[in-house]
């Protein structure tokens, strides 16, 4: 391995040569306090920037081990260090020539604290520093060029002066703000802890008092600055927790079952639901929603007309389409509002729930009696662990009327009179939502300002009034008794069967031209997979472009490793997720990737399900 001085010499010698000569600097370099690794060098100044890493050993980084001793803390610390590096890099780097010349950048960061491959903690095994952590940081560098020739002196400055300065400012514990770092780590640990407590209290979400839910604008996810009304729980829904770091915290607990959020237009309903949707992830301190936590399997469901659907059994909701179209294996290139919403629900159930129909369901809030639950406590730990894992996957559905198909949500008395049941393919959600809970343990939180018919099926009704929440359950029940909706229930005896699907391996093809794998990600909503474009604009719980990058890689892994024409989609996703859990996200790429962020099985399934070439066979 050569040192910093020789790298500098080399760069100065490269001055004015053609850009391709930069390839020569690929390799590892011993800097005074860390190792610089140049994994990959870009082909020209306009291409994606070059991939770099620095490794700072524990005796230099000196990060106290209590900051990474639990999994939550470690993930939070990695996120924190990435943000510090980002700040220092923005401050230090500047444009130095054509194209991307001069940039030094880590992965893009938003409000969420996610497990990211941008930073890793390296613990030491030498005895003199065994309580300290080191850091590996991955980032990209736009190697400088004037036109297409190398700017050697600028490159030497960037690599041999700027990078050491950034490292020194952001990755050495002595230069960090210790209190802020601790707060980051403790906040995330508390949020994870809170999320774990939900099931035991039979809650699906918790919104802490004092939370700031509204965002600065439709394109700015930071908290609204002025005029934001802080959240206060209605007294009758108030719960308390004693967090490991923060101590007592109060807020609104949303119980398992069916919850309506009602209220006038512009009174904060959607803002509350949006915070709950993203409560499956942790947020940075100061976000305002850092203690809004949601069941980890909560899935936003919406209408998404125009999407493709591949062989999904939407028959629990939709039957007898015109022209005799099959809804047991429903294929379309262009779904309607209602069929897309039905497919979105069934697809979430397909990867979330293990058993259906007459077999016992596994939802914590579902059909198991207390008696059977007690019996289970006698069984081995392993069995309990397995059950707990399965329970963690049972979806909670989140629906907002703003993005739902009206004819999927409601069908009132008058319409039932005019259009007979046998002329209407759709069984509306209102007739299925109770069965979902009773048969499968699937809870629903539904924003519905427009139809009081739902009072009949709701367990809890929360009203938003001037951005304040009230528990109006009793009143809604009284009204439901006073004015009958007079609807005929159309849902039948039970929710119905969920048919698992086996993907046809050839229908997922990441290759393009001569390249075996060509995947490309744009922001959080577009993914190019081989020759296909996947539109994920309606998959609202992909919060970070790094998640989509990792999803793209996981799709390739799913195809190459596990799609064999026999396994179901759900089994394939289980295997991929288990690999990531045991080996880390690095198994998704052949070189050290700094731009992956952790995602959920639901979003991986969502991407596969939106691939227009996907074809499946039903597993009966
Ligand atoms: P609804 O779904 O009830 O029609 P929204 O949730 O879309 O209402 O909110 C309407 C507007 O009010 C949005 O601009 C939102 O940012 C803002 N808003 C929501 N909650 C609050 C709050 N707690 N304090 C201040 N403004 C809020
Ligand atoms: Mg709304």
Which residue ranges define each predicted feature?
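N-terminal accessory targeting/assembly segments
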Residues: 1-193, 198-202, 213, 615-620
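Flexible beta-alpha connector loops of hexameric P-loop NTPases
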Residues: 151, 322-338, 410-426
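Long, charge-dense accessory insertions within large macromolecular proteins
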Residues: 173-229, 306, 323-330, 339
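N-terminal pre-Walker A segment at the start of P-loop NTPase domains
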Residues: 216-250, 293-294, 298, 302-309, ...
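Glycine-rich phosphate-binding P-loop
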Residues: 249-277
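Post-Walker A helix-loop "phosphate-sensing" segment adjacent to the P-loop in P-loop NTPases
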Residues: 278-289
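Conserved P-loop NTPase nucleotide-binding/switch module
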Residues: 349-358, 366, 371, 389-433, ...
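Conserved NTP phosphate-binding and transfer environment spanning the P-loop NTPase/kinase superfamily
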Residues: 438-441, 447-620
């Amino acid at each position: 391995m050569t040192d910093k001085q020789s790298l500098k010499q080399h760069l100065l010698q490269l001055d004015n040569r053609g850009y391709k000569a930069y390839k020569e600097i690929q390799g590892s370099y011993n800097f005074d306090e860390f190792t610089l690794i140049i994994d990959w060098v870009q082909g020209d100044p306009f291409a994606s920037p070059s991939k770099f890493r620095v490794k700072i050993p524990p005796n230099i980084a000196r990060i106290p081990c209590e900051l990474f001793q639990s999994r939550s803390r470690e993930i939070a610390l990695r996120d924190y260090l990435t943000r510090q590096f980002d700040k220092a890099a923005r401050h230090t780097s500047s444009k130095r020539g054509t194209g991307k010349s001069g940039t030094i950048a880590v992965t893009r960061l938003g409000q969420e604290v996610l497990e990211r491959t941008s930073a890793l903690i390296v613990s030491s095994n030498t005895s003199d520093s065994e309580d300290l952590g080191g850091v590996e940081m991955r980032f990209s560098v736009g190697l400088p060029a004037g036109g297409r020739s190398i700017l050697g002196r600028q490159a030497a400055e960037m690599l041999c002066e700027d990078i050491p300065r950034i490292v020194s400012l952001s990755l050495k514990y002595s230069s960090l703000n210790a209190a802020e770092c601790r707060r980051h780590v403790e906040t995330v640990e508390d949020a994870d802890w809170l999320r774990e407590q939900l099931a035991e209290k039979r809650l699906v979400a918790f919104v802490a008092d004092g939370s700031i839910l509204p965002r600065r604008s439709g394109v700015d996810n930071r908290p609204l600055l002025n005029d934001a009304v802080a959240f206060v729980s209605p007294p009758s829904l108030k719960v308390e927790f004693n967090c490991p770091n923060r101590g007592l915290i109060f807020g609104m607990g949303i119980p398992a079952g069916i919850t309506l959020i009602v209220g006038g237009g512009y009174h904060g309903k959607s803002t509350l639901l949006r915070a709950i949707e993203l409560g499956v992830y942790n947020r940075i301190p100061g976000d305002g929603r850092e203690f809004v936590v949601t069941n980890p399997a909560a899935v936003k469901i919406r209408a998404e007309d125009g999407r493709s659907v591949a062989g999904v059994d939407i028959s629990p909701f939709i039957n007898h389409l015109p022209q005799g179209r099959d809804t047991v294996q429903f294929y379309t290139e262009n779904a309607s509002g209602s069929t897309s919403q039905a497919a979105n629900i069934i697809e979430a159930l397909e990867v979330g729930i293990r058993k259906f129909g007459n077999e016992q369901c596994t939802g914590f809030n579902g059909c198991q009696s207390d008696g059977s639950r007690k019996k289970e406590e006698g069984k081995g730990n392993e069995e309990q662990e397995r059950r707990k894992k399965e329970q963690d996957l049972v979806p909670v559905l989140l629906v907002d009327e703003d993005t739902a198909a009206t004819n999927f949500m409601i069908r009132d008395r008058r319409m039932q009179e005019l259009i007979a049941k046998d002329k209407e393919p759709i069984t509306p959600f209102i007739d299925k939502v109770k069965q979902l809970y009773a048969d499968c343990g699937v809870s629903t939180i539904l924003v519905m300002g427009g139809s009081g018919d739902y009072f009949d099926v709701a367990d809890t009704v929360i009203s938003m009034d001037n951005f304040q929440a009230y528990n109006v359950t009793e009143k809604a029940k009284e009204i439901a008794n006073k004015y009958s909706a007079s609807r005929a229930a159309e849902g039948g005896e039970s929710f119905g069967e969920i048919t698992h699907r086996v993907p046809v391996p050839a229908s997922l093809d990441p290759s393009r031209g001569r390249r075996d794998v060509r995947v490309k990600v744009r922001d959080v909503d577009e993914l190019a997979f081989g020759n296909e474009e996947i539109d994920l604009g309606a998959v609202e719980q992909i919060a970070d472009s790094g998640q989509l990058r990792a999803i793209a890689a996981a799709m390739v892994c799913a195809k190459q490793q596990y799609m064999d024409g026999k396994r179901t989609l759900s089994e394939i996703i289980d295997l991929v997720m288990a690999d990531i859990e045991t080996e880390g996200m690095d198994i998704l790429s052949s070189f050290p990737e700094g731009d992956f962020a952790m995602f959920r099985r639901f979003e991986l399934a969502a991407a596969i399900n939106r691939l227009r070439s996907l074809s499946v066979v039903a597993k009966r």
